[in-house]
Amino acid sequence: MQRTRLAEGNLANDLLHPWALEADPKVKERNRYINVQAFANCRIHLRVAEGECDFINASPITLEDSVTGEGRKYIATQVGCAFGINHMRFCLPINQGPKLGHLADFWHMVFHESKEVGVIVMLTQTFEAGREKCAQYFPLDTEQASMVLLADESDVLFDESGQTEPGVLGRVTLLESTFDAKSRSEIRKLELAIGSESKIVWHFLFAGWADYSKPEGSDRQALLDLIKLSASKSSPDNPRIVHCSAGVGRTGTFIALDHLLCELESGHLLNLEPEADPVFKTVDQMREQRMMMVYNEMQMQFIYEVLREQTDRKLGKITGWNMDSPNGSEERSAKIAKLNDPADYLPTSKPELEAVPDRSHTPTRSRSGTPELPDPVNE
């Protein structure tokens, strides 16, 4: 079904088609990967002045709560394209040179799409296996506690006469930074200020998940703890902003697990018809809203494995039966018949995503391991 959607989207000449893709060069150059785009009719629109490009590679994802009928909301995105310093706008760490990409656009989205409190879940390192996976878009520590959002005339909030700092629209400031051992996550409490308004943003960086893979061992339980922890800082109707590198593989897997575990906790998954497959249904619904969500079979299998394990625990918690007993095994298999056979989901290799060609110099590493650009004055 995904191949059919992508083929239809590529061939569609009508932007009203549900899976149409925009061909504008300004849109294409804002994608980190050539083959991962947001559908034209299911994407976040930046609030910019009329005539300016409002594209950001971010898709609103809504999955229905089967009990209440209300939508669980997320935003799947990617951060920081491999652009040079002359491309539109960027963030400046205090006393540091500019970093790569449309980072101010990302923070604008966080500001406008979040409610009173923003929640960001980051499932990638900035560098993995020697490759840049994500731009450094947030303050790392107290030595670089603030990042400036540079003003641009395309901003709807831009008011040159009201600027207290020339050329500065806002800033991201680190208030607290901790490491949660249970969820194996770096947790940062940030203040995002744009214009005269500000809000708190919680940022979770999970380090236990390499690209194209699945968490193993204790990292698996840590991911489940992160799902609960990030949910506790938000509400179902306040979209958690989730990203990895491309915003489809690890991102889609996280969102699917969050939704399905909520469905399990409510009891809905324990009352399904034997032929029902909630994992397939959820992934298919996500792929209708953003291409390639849950990128490979290994990640698909991982969702089945986790849901099977958590269903076992749920049944044990409810009935008090022994999971290792023969009767317990029969009851378990009857309840989760569609979740208990990984044979159809053996991992197979898929090609790596193709990055947009770098239009700037190859970045060097800073003290923190994040990329730096040469001084533009010397170019």
What are these regions (language model features)?
Residues 1-379:
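Cys-based phosphatases of the PTP/DUSP/CDC25 superfamily and their flanking regulatory architecture
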